[in-house]
């Protein structure tokens, strides 16, 4: 699908994307690169990184892969420093690394709960903390007239209500959203850094979708989604581009929901025509009923 953005909207910028070697993270890496940015992707699996970098470079995108675990502060610092040393600056940080699996709360070990919190919530803060020195206004490599950089945290909508078998992810993403809002307040005020989030819904062709949503459940989910379809990785990448380029220059502290309206939706228990018939019947009975005298003793 063609992009609605001009091909140079992030030209000359440098973006570091955690989890950028696969799924949504790779699509964001690819679209940022196609729109002019230089790309550093971070991940734990060397082969995935190598394949992703090769794919990006085949498109004419300047890209490097950096091994690291977002849970480790030393890895976060090392990857940020390596990005700066290679490209000379850092403009955009996208925290897309995430952990997820299904487990009933009673079957989920404290270690399993902690692991997802560490990847999603602690990992997001580790990367933000390490990147601050290069994202803030007036940082090395930054034009003083251009202001600060931009951070995008990939979240979810699971914690907006409650979700079956994902208490660990719900807790982690709630923490990510709180981090987004608080950093937008503090770092926007002190360092001119914009901080936003994106909460994807079901996105086809991703490891998370294949792991968490079997085909039978996906088909059932479509029945009560307002748009009757799952999203594409492209949808999330376009949201990330909007938040990173000048089109989103006055947006900060927002977690943008990109889920086709799914989290707002509920199964339709009555067809629309049945509702009309029921309403007419109720109205008819109401008019036929004698008004009578008030029966209250008050």
UniProtKB/Swiss-Prot annotation:
Tell me the superkingdom of the source: Eukaryota
Q: Which GO terms describe its biological process?
A: fatty acid catabolic process
Q: Which Pfam families match?
A: adh_short_C2
The record lists the catalysed reaction(s) as: a (2E,4Z)-dienoyl-CoA + NADPH + H(+) = a 4,5-saturated-(3E)-enoyl-CoA + NADP(+); a (2E,4E)-dienoyl-CoA + NADPH + H(+) = a 4,5-saturated-(3E)-enoyl-CoA + NADP(+)
Chief subcellular location equals other
- Residue spans making up a coiled coil are none
Give binding positions for substrate: 44, 71, 101, 109-111
PANTHER family assigned = PEROXISOMAL 2,4-DIENOYL-COA REDUCTASE (PTHR43296), PEROXISOMAL 2,4-DIENOYL-COA REDUCTASE [(3E)-ENOYL-COA-PRODUCING] (PTHR43296:SF2)
Functional note = Auxiliary enzyme of beta-oxidation. Participates in the degradation of unsaturated fatty enoyl-CoA esters having double bonds in both even- and odd-numbered positions in peroxisome. Catalyzes the NADP-dependent reduction of 2,4-dienoyl-CoA to yield trans-3-enoyl-CoA.
For this entry, the protein name equals Peroxisomal 2,4-dienoyl-CoA reductase [(3E)-enoyl-CoA-producing]
Origin species: Arabidopsis thaliana (Mouse-ear cress)
Its lineage opens with: Eukaryota, Viridiplantae, Streptophyta, Embryophyta, Tracheophyta
